[in-house]
Amino acid sequence: MSNQEAIGLIDSGVGGLTVLKEALKQLPNERLIYLGDTARCPYGPRPAEQVVQFTWEMADFLLKKRIKMLVIACNTATAVALEEIKAALPIPVVGVILPGARAAVKVTKNNKIGVIGTLGTIKSASYEIAIKSKAPTIEVTSLDCPKFVPIVESNQYRSSVAKKIVAETLQALQLKGLDTLILGCTHYPLLRPVIQNVMGSHVTLIDSGAETVGEVSMLLDYFDIAHTPEAPTQPHEFYTTGSAKMFEEIASSWLGIENLKAQQIHLGGNEND
């Protein structure tokens, strides 16, 4: 494990780009390699064993690129695969759930926290467990939002359709008296302005992915593997199992990087199995 090696980020699609965007801000000297499994997205409705298998396939691909740290930038994959992968790999592995839960506990004033995520993340109760382990008296209300990821993956997150779907879905949370809402899926920050508008300015939104980059920074220092500024940095790399063109459009727009190039790869057997 060398300081000059890259940090790898994996996600079920383009959602993890919200984590990568924060990493570009907080860790400007680091080289980043991103892999989004867009062909098999969403992970939320899939059985846990299958999500674990897909997460391993992505991790193995990036390990061949000689990464020094792995960020599982996907809440569903973090919920079911983090502990297994962390125990098996010789490099630091970071998930997105614990940092988000910690931040929410710090921020809430009325002890009423909401969590929105995919069916897989919500069913796992990972956020609720993490929050209650820090503050047992906090009331946690969880809601799965199955239509949010497809909106983002189809590049419709700025559309009127997105506004309608978000408003209809979050209606169930509006009367719960929440003062804090965890965006428990890394796709959701792309919908942040719409979510904030629906929930109201009195509700603080927690971006679990952005919180995770703080932990990555801390681990780089702890293991003394931060990239030394004087060493030349190679370009960031982007891989997707889906359409490279669609990925490039969303990534360029979200990250503000012109001429961003992504490479299509195949994982496992049938890419849509």
From Swiss-Prot:
SUPFAM superfamilies xrefs: Aspartate/glutamate racemase (SSF53681)
Protein residues bound to substrate: 11-12, 43-44, 75-76, 186-187
GO biological process terms on file: cell wall organization; peptidoglycan biosynthetic process; regulation of cell shape
Pathway(s) it belongs to: Cell wall biogenesis; peptidoglycan biosynthesis
Pfam families: Asp_Glu_race
Statement: the UniProt record of this protein carries the keyword Isomerase: yes
InterPro entries: Asp/Glu/hydantoin_racemase, Asp/Glu_race, Asp/Glu_racemase_AS_1, Asp/Glu_racemase_AS_2, Glu_race
EC number(s) per entry: 5.1.1.3
Residues of the active site: 74, 185
Keyword Isomerase: yes
GO MF annotations, alphabetized: glutamate racemase activity; identical protein binding
Keyword list, A-Z: Cell shape, Cell wall biogenesis/degradation, Isomerase, Peptidoglycan synthesis
Enzyme kind, highest EC tier: isomerase
Reaction(s) catalysed (UniProt annotation): L-glutamate = D-glutamate
NCBIfam families found in the cross-reference section: glut_race, PRK00865.1-3
Functional summary from the UniProt entry: Provides the (R)-glutamate required for cell wall biosynthesis.
Assembly information from the UniProt record: Homodimer.
Family statement: Belongs to the aspartate/glutamate racemases family.
Name of protein: Glutamate racemase
Organism: Enterococcus faecalis (strain ATCC 700802 / V583)
Species lineage: Bacteria, Bacillati, Bacillota, Bacilli, Lactobacillales
